[in-house]
UniProtKB/Swiss-Prot annotation:
It is found in: Cytoplasm. The 20S proteasome core is composed of 14 alpha and 14 beta subunits that assemble into four stacked heptameric rings, resulting in a barrel-shaped structure. The two inner rings, each composed of seven catalytic beta subunits, are sandwiched by two outer rings, each composed of seven alpha subunits. The catalytic chamber with the active sites is on the inside of the barrel. Has a gated structure, the ends of the cylinder being occluded by the N-termini of the alpha-subunits. Is capped by the proteasome-associated ATPase, ARC. The formation of the proteasomal ATPase ARC-20S proteasome complex, likely via the docking of the C-termini of ARC into the intersubunit pockets in the alpha-rings, may trigger opening of the gate for substrate entry. Interconversion between the open-gate and close-gate conformations leads to a dynamic regulation of the 20S proteasome proteolysis activity. One of its GO terms (biological process) is proteasomal protein catabolic process. The keyword Cytoplasm applies. HAMAP family: Proteasome_A_B. It holds the Pfam family Proteasome. The gene is prcA. InterPro entries: Ntn_hydrolases_N, Proteasome_alpha, Proteasome_alpha-type, Proteasome_asu_bac, Proteasome_sua/b. This is Proteasome subunit alpha. Belongs to the peptidase T1A family.
Amino acid sequence: MSTPFYVSPEQLMKDKADYARKGIARGRAVVVLAHADGIAFVSENASRALHKISEIYDRVAFAAVGKYNEFENLRVAGVRYADVRGYSYDRSDVTARGLANAYAQTLGAIFTTESKPYEVELVVAEVGRRPETDQIYRLTYDGSVADEHGFVAMGGSADQISAKLRERWHAGLTLAEALRLAVEALGSDAAAEAAGTGPREIAPDHLEVAVLDRTRERRTFRRLSGPVLAGLLAGTG
């Protein structure tokens, strides 16, 4: 009788974590950063049909990297959660913190009990009435939650991009300044570092950009594209 194959729990969790991290690192990065009038979301994404950045509710938005079908399932579940909570209680009861907790439970359960973890990393953000009340939460494949302040980068080359943001970001940036910083940071990825040529130029039509705009009433989410985005990046918007 052969001896059953045994894998220790520690090794199993390590293998799952390595698998998820590799899947996430293959994707293009997303940058989320606060500015004077709200929160900006920027990703290098040429597709106009497959979004990495989406509205969840009035003042809450979602960004993700990794496997599209997995984070799309989470997005849809988040919209349903928000709709039910807003209808059952009050619209103001739908918060980024509550949604982040719900996602953390889902991701943690999948990572622990399923043979394959989700290859996703998420940001859930909520724009406040004042800059100091903005909330940005980062969730990883195992359900871990981090409360981020000011900015966050996730996906491929996240370390290099975060280093650029750390050097340049400060409170009170205008929207145009925040977008230009985000695009420059996205261009400062591992490929640009290896080539030694400085940040890559990323055309506006290869970007997916959205904002939570605190100056708007009720629904604060809006997408930026075309001449509006090009003008902001050129400093003329």
